[in-house]
Amino acid sequence: MSGHSKWNNIKRKKEKTDGARAKVFTKIGREISVAVRDGGPNPASNSKLADLIAKAKRMSVPNDNIQRIIKKAEGGDKTEFEAITYEGYGPGGVAVMVETLTDNRNRTAADLRHYFDKNGGNLGAMGCVAFLFNQKGVIDISLEDKDADEAMMDALDAGAEDFDASEDAAEVTTDPENYSAVVKALEKKGYEILSDDLAMVPMTTTRLTNPDQLKQMGKLLDSLEDNDDVQNVWHSLENEEDLPE
């Protein structure tokens, strides 16, 4: 699963733009608004909201911002966000799934189609690549000052399915139903959560070697991630580390 880590995506984006922090606030804010609309403003009785608040704090979103978003949603904000997942192929046949929260599906579809067309891909119909992915909980933890073998045992004991360690971090994979419980168990054990999400993990991957296709793929991912309507981008590129900076 190396190369498909959400943490890798976030790190690449943070290195490329000073506006990444504001983008993160916007995206998590939309998720919180939808959670309040669907389940109410009290995290004690709205587990989805509670998970998002914890996630926002891990992403360094100030508590004042979080409370402001909740109050705005509770006060009857008329903006209606709709969750839509778009699917397509990037250059070289790389499968791409794009999760969005949008208040204008026509605008979002047009934007995404433009990004794909401009960068050697094509936006497809619903279901055209979803069968190539499995939903998993993906949790990236810091291994700084931690023993990798001990961390693996802690993750597996918490209910993880897989553990993939690198030099200073590890990617923990879980069943979607166990995802929140594993995050909480690892936090309780003192691990720093670098990122966590319900991810669409590719069952097979595509390796790009053509420099032009790698450049196009990098531009496609950047364009998608920079769009405020886009919440998550999942893809089957095997060698993401080869994308140009």
Please describe what each predicted stretch is.
Residues 138-245:
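Positively charged, low-complexity, intrinsically disordered RNA-binding extensions
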Residues 1-124, 128-138, 235:
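N-terminal cationic and glycine-rich segments that engage phosphates or anionic surfaces
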